[in-house]
Amino acid sequence: MLMITSFANPRVAQAFVDYMATQGVILTIQQHNQSDVWLADESQAERVRAELARFLENPADPRYLAASWQAGHTGSGLHYRRYPFFAALRERAGPVTWVMMIACVVVFIAMQILGDQEVMLWLAWPFDPTLKFEFWRYFTHALMHFSLMHILFNLLWWWYLGGAVEKRLGSGKLIVITLISALLSGYVQQKFSGPWFGGLSGVVYALMGYVWLRGERDPQSGIYLQRGLIIFALIWIVAGWFDLFGMSMANGAHIAGLAVGLAMAFVDSLNARKRK
């Protein structure tokens, strides 16, 4: 099967599927974060994409509405899935996403009980030459958060972006992005501020860059990030760099993470194009 496109609005997706059915082409919809349209007979891909281009120019054209009437999908037959809060969390997060979230929460609780300094002595970037072979330190700095707002903000983005990557591209891809971005963003940040820093934001920015550029260059990957959100991320970096909000931010980690994510997305999308 071949994924043709994704629609944010499930009714629009259904309208296109109904119209193609009247043209003798069977498409199916799979609901994830968006409504993904799949084609079973890949020999019809060129024809479907041509029709999709015409559809996107004017989805409200009467012929599409007529097709929906013919297929019987204009009423309330389209069912929207409703999830309780925790069910929604489970639906959009794979095992790696969950393990990271749980690890961050456990470390945060430990920091509240034992104190920041005690936990940092074990998890911070190597702050002494004798610690350079304690390899976990190059990654575990990402688990430490210093306020409730800090951890909530990072874990929300981690769940949203990391969950999408894991669901679409697999746990292995999320692990690779996480490890590389934690290592490189941590390296850059310690050059800026020394070893006493923490937080998942370097990884989050890597995921932002990765999901946005991979979605732009390889829509069939099934991941995407609205351009408004990547613009927000850039504004946040600028605000942090110039200390506009009076908050201590790991600016080096943010910039390095974003660069890592963009670079990995460029390489992966290039490889995806070569395979076609």
Curated annotation (Swiss-Prot):
The keyword Oxidoreductase does not apply. Residues 1-93, 163-168, 213-222, 273-276 are cytoplasmic. It comes from the Bacteria. Gene3D superfamilies: 3.30.70.2350, Rhomboid-like (1.20.1540.10). It catalyses: Cleaves type-1 transmembrane domains using a catalytic dyad composed of serine and histidine that are contributed by different transmembrane domains. GO terms for biological process: proteolysis. Its main location: membrane. Belongs to the peptidase S54 family. Rhomboid-type serine protease that catalyzes intramembrane proteolysis. HAMAP family: Rhomboid_GlpG (MF_01594). This is Rhomboid protease GlpG. It comes from Escherichia coli (strain K12).
